[in-house]
Design a protein with these regions (language model features):
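Terminal or standalone catalytic/regulatory effector modules within metabolic enzymes
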Residues: 15, 30, 36-54
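N-terminal phosphate-binding or glycine-rich loops at protein starts, especially the Walker A/P-loop
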Residues: 11-33
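Generic hydrophobic/packing signal
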Residues: 9-10, 20, 36, 40-43, ...
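N-terminal amphipathic alpha-helix/helix-capping segment at the start of soluble metabolic enzymes
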Residues: 1-18, 66, 70
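Active-site beta->alpha loop and helix N-cap motifs at the rims of alpha/beta catalytic domains
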Residues: 33, 48-153
């Protein structure tokens, strides 16, 4: 049985650059047609990481920005995904379980199909709830391990 290979466009550090290189949503929607026209991506990373915080710095409403940015991809049949920091999913410090659970429902409502979860500590106690919450919200859950080198990890 042959396996289908799907390519994903990932902006690894773009959303984490404290606004230095992150385009506004009006700029993002202008490049969406070119990405779609390439015809090689089944999935596009549209938010997560620092994306929403940067929207706020620009004075944009993150809810509106994510919806606008994901819309052209959905119309073209392309799934969208986001970076998720597991326990630190909403900020750089731990977030309570009830807030994390709501987070996935909101992201799905905004138009995000897939959550790509990682935990800097590779701690399954932080990753497992993310998988559950994503599935409960109707999202696809992908997880990754981090390459960590230290005497402790």
């Amino acid at each position: 049985m042959k396996k289908e290979i799907k390519f994903s466009l990932v902006f690894r550090d773009m959303w984490q650059s404290a606004g230095k290189y992150v385009p506004r949503v009006d700029q993002l929607v202008k490049v969406a047609p070119a990405i779609i026209e390439m015809g090689c991506f089944a999935r596009v990373e549209t938010n997560g990481g620092g994306f929403e915080q940067v929207n706020l710095l620009f004075g944009e409403n993150p809810n509106k920005a994510v919806r606008e940015w994901t819309k052209p991809f959905h119309e073209a049949g392309i799934q969208t995904h986001m970076l998720d920091r597991a326990l630190n999913g909403l900020r750089m410090s731990p977030v309570p379980a009830d807030v994390r659970k709501l987070f996935y429902k909101v992201k799905k409502a905004q138009g995000t199909d897939i959550t790509r979860t990682f935990c800097g500590l590779n701690d399954i106690r932080n990753i497992a709830p993310s998988i559950t919450y994503a599935h409960e919200a109707g999202m696809i859950s992908q997880c990754s391990l981090c390459i960590t080198h230290s005497p402790i990890h």
